[in-house]
Amino acid sequence: MAYSFTEKKRIRKSFAKRATVHQVPFLLATQIESYTQFLQAETPAARRKTEGLQAAFNAIFPIASHNGLARMEFVSYHLSNPPFDVKECQQRGLTFHSALRAKVRLIINDRENPGKVKEVKEQEVYMGEIPLMTSTGSFVINGTERVIVSQLHRSPGVFFEHDKGKTHSSGKLLFSARIIPYRGSWLDFEFDPKDILYFRVDRRRKMPVTILLKSIGLTPEQILAHFFVFDNFTLQSEGAQLEFVPERLRGEVARFDIADKNGRVVVEKDKRINAKHIRDLDSAGTKLISVPEDYLLGRVLAKNIIDPDTGEVIANANDELTETVLENLREAGVKQIQTLYTNDLDQGPYMSQTLRVDETADQTAARIAIYRMMRPGEPPTEEAVEALFQRLFYSEESYDLSRVGRMKVNSRLSRPSGEGSMVLQDEDILETIKILVNLRNGKGEVDDIDHLGNRRVRCVGELAENQFRAGLSRVERAVKERLGQAETENLMPHDLINSKPISSAIREFFGSSQLSQFMDQTNPLSEITHKRRVSALGPGGLTRERAGFEVRDVHPTHYGRVCPIETPEGPNIGLINSLALYARLNEYGFLETPYRKVENSKLTDQVDYLSAIEEGKYVVAQANATVDAEGNLTDELVSAREGSERETRMVTPDRVQYIDVAPSQIVSAAASLVPFLEHDDANRALMGANMQRQAVPCLRPDKPLVGTGIERTVAVDSGTAVQAMRGGVVDYVDAMRIVIRVNDDEAVAGEVGVDIYNLIKYTRSNQNTNINQRPMVKVGDIVARGDVVADGASTDLGELALGQNMLVAFMPWNGYNFEDSILISERVVAEDRYTSIHIEELSVVARDTKLGPEEITRDISNLAEAQLARLDESGITYIGAEVEAGDVLVGKVTPKGETQLTPEEKLLRAIFGEKASDVKDTSLRVPSGMSGIVIDVQVFTREGVTRDKRAQSIIDDELKRYRLDLNDQLRIVEGDAFQRLERLLIDKTVNGGPKKLAKGAKLTKEYLAEIDKYHWFDIRPADEEVAAQLEAVKEAIEQKRHEFDLAFEEKRKKLTQGDELPPGVIKMVKVYLAVKRRLQPGDKMAGRHGNKGVVSKIVPIEDMPYMADGTPADIVLNPLGVPSRMNVGQILETHLGWAARGLGQRIGDMLKASAKAQELRPLLAQIYNESGKAEDLDSLSDAEVLELATNLKKGVPFATPVFDGAHEDEIRRMLDLAYPDDIAKEKGLTASKQQVTLHDGRTGEAFERPVTLGVMHMLKLHHLVDDKMHARSTGPYSLVTQQPLGGKAQFGGQRFGEMEVWALEAYGASYVLQEMLTVKSDDVNGRTKVYENIVKGEHSIDAGMPESFNVLVKEIRSLGIDIDLDRY
């Protein structure tokens, strides 16, 4: 196998037993593809599909005027180039967007002859701004990165369910059906406890369902014919004859003697009719059975019976037969009658009963009844009734099932799936009611609403399209009204279309929708997980309060589609999920997962993606099934899932149709990063997966020694590590940029064959963590497309590195690791292992106030020179300044209103003039509890305001950097051109040239080297073709120079034009502080198995427990944290990490002894190729083997993939290889090499029992004590109660609550209690007096009335109770 540029630097030894046929798909594909399909920006207008923006335009246009004389048609749209790039938008607080322009055609017909077109006006109209997605799947809205989370909602279609017996006290199941469109009114059908079937529209008042059936044109006779089979009777003078249908009689109790045609009694009265009786009647050729008169009574007629002579209706359909009715029938000479066949078991009389409840006479009355239900109180005119009924379910404007909905309706109603209109059909309603009645009759199954075949994902593109369509429909209303005036006032399309409704709908969605979230940017994993999140909440989804247990639970169809582990703890559990590693969306928005095809028990290389519904038809085996070298399933029985319930059963191999593509298919990206996940309890695995997202990037990232092999995929797909867009040779590298000269075969003709990667340096993330990229390549390195050329935050050699590898000992230590506390060695802090950099953004704005403009200046009165020392002449701090809490970062003064002057101020004014008193100092200072180094300053100035020197110097620096990029591109372009020229000119005959070159002379390399390259163009070749080529190269270079000059000019214009600032703001300054946070007691740490704790103490290195060879442990964890939590994965990780460290030390020792590559190869082969996946070490050169070995000195990285990881015997083998007996003895290892005899650092004595010691990857989480630590002396008070505010953000105090008061009462500390309740809280006069007393040096307290008592008195008075306090 071929290794990439970075992979061969440090190969991760994998223990995977199964080769992967299907690579993990690009992790951000769902987001990026969805939005690309929405915009279709790159697709030519003629070839655009009807989706996204195109679909929205097609749905609204054409718009016709009310009189039909004018109409506006949509032609096409295009998106302009964004005015600012992503970085500029973030700096300036703008939205990264593109202007949408649509070409529309206004057609005006002739008034006299409406069929004739009078004039056509075509124009491009501005339709608002559409935010663009960045290359990593996020959006920049008002300068901050946001993510649109996908929504999991109930799919449009038809669903059948029952209430599980909860509605009625008897526990009777009440069945219901619901037709849910994508857009439009919901239609519900439901049985009540009396078995009458009702319908509702949009959850309004219920009405008998037969009203709906009558309104679509059915008569009572037709309704009964649809829902019942009939019994045929021939009336006789006494009794009747029943047409014999065998199946209808079985199981019934005979109410009379039943005889065959020969008169032989086959079934006696009151006997139950069984199969033998039926056979006897059948064999006797019985066609008719004589029944007595009372057998007819109570039966229900199926059809209207009309007197053949008079045409009079004798009996109506659905009438019960009574003696009177029978008598009338006989009198009229009616012989044949049909009645409804019903029974108690599987043919209930539900529709017949419903018809009796229904009081409407015909179609018109039914529609009026529906109108009254929808519009109570409005008079039902014929047109209004008809219009409302059509609009409810039959109008494409107001009702849309969508392709998904039509497909789901058709498949549930057992029709061919793709066909049908997007509105409801009469047959849809009829079929739905039939299925519902059948369910009540005990036939068929209800739907499972939590099945992923009934829930679909709405992605960014679809959500944005819905918003855009909503905005466009508002525009449509306005255009409709104005179209009538288009002809008379000679209006153009842009006069009719106002883009504001579209812009505001889009802005509202991206800015404040529940699904538009502030991106979690703590580390690369949190970014990628946030973009792969699927939420059941949001508009059109569930709410936390109403979501029950079933919706939140793991469902069998989640397998391979949604992760069963990763979900938040708390009220959102189960409502917010993560996509599984291999999951993707199909065209309908349903989640699919890949399976490998199995034919005749043999695995093929064909991989098919199946949705939850499709999967139900197949038998799917698990990835851990035993397979031989040829790919045959060898076990007699294989564990597989089959049936719609997806129950796991043991099946024979020949029945298997598909097999999982990979064991990690079930879990999400975060869960698949947990090694030995299969050995962890699910609850702890959930915490482990969630806490990895909170890991703070460390100053020096350290790859996990025990990983799962997915680390590289996550790092690269998140966009944190920089990938080469095209292959080539590294031409230039510094900390800020990498320049790559692109390979000739990958460069596009006519374009610059240079790729420049400007690295992100010390940039603030949304969570204030530091994003910094470091180059990994050297000049001259050859890289291929997709190779990692620079590491980002939390990545190490292109692999995700969230924490640090720590030497962990599991043992108690003086109670300092009680209850999950963590003991840390001082060495960890000294080596900056967990030091992280956090970047704080502090900003100040200078506004134009009523009293005059605020000014950013260094000239501030009442400030000592020492406080201004860090400010430059413009009043802004310089980069590199070390600042602490209270230091001035930006000097600012605000004009003050004229006030009564004190004598002191009058004196100052007399001495210093006006300035001293009429402004107040409102400078930007470093907030309390913060200190750091200024790393960047941004100055934004309003258009028309003169820039200060600092702002100008920032612009000059930016232009200088840009010019550098252009110069590099030009240098490489010219270099290539001159190389081609040299090859072209050498040995060519010339007519003359510089330095008196003689005619007829041949050009030599030496001659060309002597003259300046630009003078080569002055050479006059004898060959005309060569001369033409020379001229062409000269023109090409000049053209490129011209292009670069234009680009530079455009950049200068962009930087020098005024900035867009909020109204009233003249100038804004942003100062970025880098704060260094070392690990300290109170910081939260965690492993990857849900084993979290708080640092309790940092112990001097000499006091830590140490091994026999003197190596001290880095961290001491409590062994009691493992058994009850059942996350044994951490112990296995510790053992394997211990082996990894040992192998690294062995390789390091060999390198110290100057071992050659050939000596290293046998050990490397033992490590990599004795178990698990084999590595192709022979393909590496000796230099590459030495580089690999150098990178392995700190430990050989292992990959133990989820559910396919290292077994115990493999861990033992690695431990034996890492610690041969001589080394093991020296370190004090036990025979198993999994435990060590440790010594107490303080006494030097060995501990009584051996201790589990090894290497674990530990993370420092974002809950840092520095962010929580807070102290207040005096500060702000609440306005009403006058009590101190709460919380760090408000600079609040600590609440002394009810229970704390009890504690002081219990101690009898009455004076302390009094001051707590008065002067330290809300006794306003008392606390002022205390301050005065302290200043005077008196230590006495006069406690007064707490303000909260006055509030209580006022509140009681507000209830009309006169309460007053008698003061004695």
Swiss-Prot record:
Classification via HAMAP family: RNApol_bact_RpoB
A GO CC term assigned to this protein in UniProt: DNA-directed RNA polymerase complex
One of the GO BP terms on file: DNA-templated transcription
Role according to the record: DNA-dependent RNA polymerase catalyzes the transcription of DNA into RNA using the four ribonucleoside triphosphates as substrates.
Family label: Belongs to the RNA polymerase beta chain family.
InterPro entries reported in the protein's UniProt record: DNA-dir_RNA_pol_bsu_ext_1_sf (IPR042107), DNA-dir_RNA_pol_bsu_external_1 (IPR019462), DNA-dir_RNA_pol_su2 (IPR015712), DNA-dir_RNAP_su2_dom (IPR007120), DNA-dir_RNAP_su2_hyb_sf (IPR037033), RNA_pol_bsu_bac (IPR010243), RNA_pol_bsu_CS (IPR007121), RNA_pol_bsu_protrusion (IPR007644)
Keywords: DNA-directed RNA polymerase, Nucleotidyltransferase, Transcription, Transferase
Protein's organism: Cupriavidus pinatubonensis (strain JMP 134 / LMG 1197) (Cupriavidus necator (strain JMP 134))
Self-association and partners: The RNAP catalytic core consists of 2 alpha, 1 beta, 1 beta' and 1 omega subunit. When a sigma factor is associated with the core the holoenzyme is formed, which can initiate transcription.
Pfam families referenced in this protein's UniProt entry, alphabetically: RNA_pol_Rpb2_1 (PF04563), RNA_pol_Rpb2_2 (PF04561), RNA_pol_Rpb2_3 (PF04565), RNA_pol_Rpb2_45 (PF10385), RNA_pol_Rpb2_6 (PF00562), RNA_pol_Rpb2_7 (PF04560)
Protein name, UniProt field: DNA-directed RNA polymerase subunit beta
Coiled coil: none
EC number(s) from the headed UniProt entry: 2.7.7.6
Gene giving rise to this polypeptide: rpoB
Catalysed reactions listed for this entry: RNA(n) + a ribonucleoside 5'-triphosphate = RNA(n+1) + diphosphate
SUPFAM superfamilies to which the protein is assigned, alphabetical: beta and beta-prime subunits of DNA dependent RNA-polymerase
GO molecular function: DNA binding; DNA-directed RNA polymerase activity; ribonucleoside binding
